[in-house]
Amino acid sequence: MSFNLRGAVLANVSGNSQDQLQETIVDAIQSGEEKMLPGLGVLFEVIWKNADENEKHEMLETLEQGLKK
């Protein structure tokens, strides 16, 4: 049996408001649970696929700076 994690995550948050999405992200990060990481990855994939080149560059700069801390 195969489980489509990406599809499950997207189905779970599809139609959510910005506030609901923020709550989902904050809860996942604050919980610190490893099992939440794939879901955050799926959400990041959506952000990345919908970002223009300037937004991608800004995200990469933010990531690079965050990893230097």
UniProtKB/Swiss-Prot annotation:
Subcellular compartments: Spore core
Assigned keywords, A-Z: Sporulation
Factors inducing expression: Expressed only in the forespore compartment of sporulating cells.
Residues of the signal peptide: none
GO biological process assignments: asexual sporulation; sporulation resulting in formation of a cellular spore
InterPro entries: SspI
Main location: other
Pfam families in UniProt: SSPI (PF14098)
HAMAP family per UniProt: SspI
Family indicated by similarity: Belongs to the SspI family.
This protein's name: Small, acid-soluble spore protein I
Gene source species: Bacillus cereus (strain ATCC 14579 / DSM 31 / CCUG 7414 / JCM 2152 / NBRC 15305 / NCIMB 9373 / NCTC 2599 / NRRL B-3711)
